[in-house]
Amino acid sequence: GKRRELYVPRDEVESLREQLALRKRLEQELVKGGQREVPPHVEAFEGSVLVGDELREFAAPVASFKKRALYGKLRAFLEREPRDKVLVLCGLRRTGKTTLVRQAILDLSSDELARAAFMQVTPFDTLAQVNRDLRKLAERGYRTVFVDEVTLLSDFVEGAALFSDVFATRGMRLVLSGTDSLGFVF
């Protein structure tokens, strides 16, 4: 193949050298496995967890959507005292489960929102990670947690009882959503 060369203008050489030195230093930190400390104001969750303003912003786009009949049952679950129960929303993909959850988040009072969280599960997450994040949320006083796409957890079926046996019995309201209705065994 042909050889192509690009020349850096003289007035940009020093800036480019500084950038290359920074990149080299950062690469060395990565190779050494250098872990940076998380600033104290940042909550260190292992998975995707939304709380506070992020949670409200996440829910905002569905504010004008019409509520479905099932919304009343979800709202009733959220309004009653927790009693060792977990609410499960299951159905086909793209049928509105997450939209329903977002609508419920929008309707939370300021006090409820301050103690609510949304967890987005990915295929790379494990039940152990979700468990650790739920424990962190419980320690910080969160009482209502929505866990979306929970059936993406490869070990979900084996450990599903964790949600009701550990967290719901301690007063946490859990709303789980997922696509594989056969995965819900409790």
Can you annotate each of these PLM segments?
Residues 1-7, 61-66:
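Short, exposed beta-strand "edge-strand" segments with a Pro/Gly-rich flavor and a Y/T-containing core
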Residues 2-33:
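A positively charged, amphipathic N-terminal helix/segment that binds anionic biomolecules
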Residues 28-186:
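Phosphate-binding site recognition
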